[in-house]
Amino acid sequence: GFAGLTSRFDLVKPVIAAVNGVAMGGGFEIALACDLIIASEKAVFALPEPKVGLAALAGGLNRLPRHIGVKRALGMILTGRHVSAYEGEHLGFVNEVVEDGIALERAHEVAEEILTCSPLSIRASKDAVYRSLDFASLEDSMKGMREEYAAVRQMIESDDFIEGPKAFAEKRPPNWKGR
């Protein structure tokens, strides 16, 4: 897939897209394959493939409906309609809109915020969110999470699982070990 991201489902670290301009077709599919999208106020998104006899087969047709719902996604996909960053934020596939030219800078700031969290908690949280999408109901997605999700089990059995609440109670920053 595009940039090696659209066909990867084994990335345990958060991936942030910083979109400063046009993200159409494959570019939008790459952004949708990321966990977070930070977009410049001038960014534009679209899956215009049907206008040229193609289809967004690198995940766009699968990911967009999961982000914004089937009807909204089909409205974009079947028309190839261009969507502004602000509309993307309103629809739910853009996490944050920033001033033109600073999307990458803001993505780095968000990455720094993520780095203050327990790495095992981040991994477990990301894994649980994506795995839950495979289930038809909320109840089914939660059953067995502690036992069946390796990343969740690793987090629960870690030193960090004790360190976080202890640091909070002691009103100090946690010292994450990642184990």
Regions found by a protein language model. Give the residues of each.
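An acidic, glycine-rich surface segment that forms the CoA-thioester-binding/catalytic face
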Residues: 1-20, 52, 62, 67, ...
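C-terminal long alpha-helix characteristic of the crotonase
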Residues: 38-43, 94-146, 153, 176-179
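Terminal low-complexity tails and localization/encapsulation signals of metabolic enzymes
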Residues: 166-179
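Glycine-rich beta-to-alpha active-site loop
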Residues: 6-52, 82
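Short helix- or helix-capping micro-motifs
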Residues: 19, 64, 72-81
